[in-house]
Amino acid sequence: MKKTIALVTGGFTGESVISLKSAEVIERNIDSEKFEVYKIIITPESWYYIDRNAIKHTIDKNDFSLNIQDKVIRFDGVFIGLHGSPGEDGKLQGYFDMVGLPYTSCDALTSAITMNKGYTKAIVEGIKDLHTARSIQLFANTPSAAEEVLAGLNLPLFVKPNNGGSSIGMSKVKTAEELPLALEKAFKEDDQVLVEEYIAGREFTIGVYKGKEGIKVLPSTEIVSSKEFFDYEAKYTAGITDEITPGRMTGEEQARVERVVTEAFRRLNCRGVVRIDYILEEETGKFFFIEVNTVPGQTEASLIPQQVRETGRTITDFYTELLETALGK
């Protein structure tokens, strides 16, 4: 008997555009013989499903159900395809825990923590062979903020909204004069900003997931961008970035990376599939942790689908494993 699945998408931030594109890919690739899928769009104004006749049906938030032509649709589980808030910061996960619905992503606590880049770095600190860039976390754009940063860190710097995604509001700062504008840009996206020293090296991203056989690591992807860094345009515009899967690493580097990201996944108590970004430092080859994305993109241009295909599996088979693991099958 088919399981009834809610595919949630949309969101409250600028990443909602990417969420909708991810949902299109997910919806096309979920096994229709095993799952009946309803795409639920979540916006600040409404949670709803649009049927084939373009009629909008509002979700009953009391139990996350639908009423279509006097038939109540209740879900067996949720595939979370919503980037940013409320799908990636723990809010939806907490709600689904309260109404008793299983879902494909990390739980509420892990989602909330990993959305905060500074807090995540503090938790993974101490994992063998994992390094983090020196950083300062700012909680307000005070007149002395730039001065505080320059006194504590060495240029060049990366300035990031602490709770953001898709590199929105992020800047690379090479001179002291560029810093105030970069801080202003980041604080427009978030009320916390993380400033990190730049690490010169090769940039990679790698998928890690928990399936029927425990924690598994996907092939890495090496990011070679023609831009200064892997920003929003580089991530979602064809031709700007070369994405090499599997990434070019020695056998020792690959084994070390797999061990480090598996331990980070375990320490952060992750579930479902996450994407961990890292740099192998130019001169030393050391692993520098950047961040973890608990609802990684699933668009045609996204990296997790590339990595899954590299293993010889179909994305349909992969989504089936994620759903069945979440449902406890």
What are these regions (language model features)?
Residues 197, 265-298, 308:
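Conserved metal-phosphate-binding beta-hairpin within the catalytic cores
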